[in-house]
Design a protein with these regions (language model features):
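A short, conserved beta-strand element enriched in hydrophobic/aromatic residues
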Residues: 44-81
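Long, charge-rich alpha-helical interaction segments
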Residues: 145-159, 171
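Cysteine/selenocysteine-centered motifs that mediate thiol-based redox chemistry or coordinate metal-sulfur cofactors
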Residues: 94-133
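Short, basic/aromatic recognition patches
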Residues: 18-25, 40-50
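Short hydrophobic short-linear motifs embedded
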Residues: 168, 172-205
């Protein structure tokens, strides 16, 4: 599972089957044991609903690395398809960062259904609020239209900053931290993997 801690504002937008714990697999779910899924290093995100230029957007921040994902222009039906939205945002943002083939393969193999709750972390939310503020300022300062903004490039841009993490002395850079996490996970993973076609994650959106 990919555990996502949603704000109440976002949680209220999710259909009941999505906001409830999910156990079913999807075509994106790798062949992992239950124990491996519970220890999934990609799991653990905080997420919030942003209203930008009257459009529903979601900003997610990975708890351990502070790596952000940005999803823009969601319609009501899109919230019921969050597994695909998450996978699409993750893979394409990693591509924008210049992730290696090995790192992309590891990320694809770790994808699993999203499970939502409202147990948000204040420290992660602090980072998320800073990123949201910077994004809003960028739209205002550049007089930019949300529709002209690449979700994936925006996520990569937001990740290129030092962030503080509670309990850690040194700052971390989310982009480097996420790539390092994927490298470690790939090195420790079993040799047998599903064959992943990265083209499945390439969106028709501007990115």
């Amino acid at each position: 599972m990919i555990n996502i801690h949603a704000t109440k504002k976002l949680y209220a937008k999710l259909p009941a089957p999505i906001s409830a714990p999910q156990s079913e697999t999807t075509p994106l779910t790798p062949t992992l044991s239950l124990g491996e899924r519970e220890q999934n290093p990609l799991s653990g995100w905080n997420a919030n609903l942003l209203i930008l230029q009257r459009r529903n957007c979601v900003l997610l921040v990975h708890d351990a690395t502070r790596f952000p994902l940005f999803v823009k222009g969601l319609l009501k039906a899109d919230f019921a398809n969050f597994n695909h939205l998450f996978a699409d945002a993750l893979m394409n943002t990693l591509l924008k960062l210049g992730a290696s083939q090995s790192q992309l393969d590891t990320a694809a193999a770790l994808l699993a259904p999203c499970r939502f709750d409202t147990a948000c972390d204040r420290s992660v939310q602090g980072t998320m609020n800073q990123m949201a503020g910077d994004l809003e300022h960028r739209l205002w300062f550049d007089n930019a239209r949300l529709d002209d903004l690449s979700s994936y490039a925006t996520g990569a841009w937001l990740s290129d900053r030092p962030c503080t993490v509670k309990g850690q002395k040194d700052c971390i850079w989310p982009n480097s931290a996420m790539l390092a996490l994927l490298s470690r996970a790939g090195n420790s993973a079993p040799a047998k993997r599903n064959v992943i076609q990265l083209a499945d994650y390439l969106s028709s959106r501007n990115g």
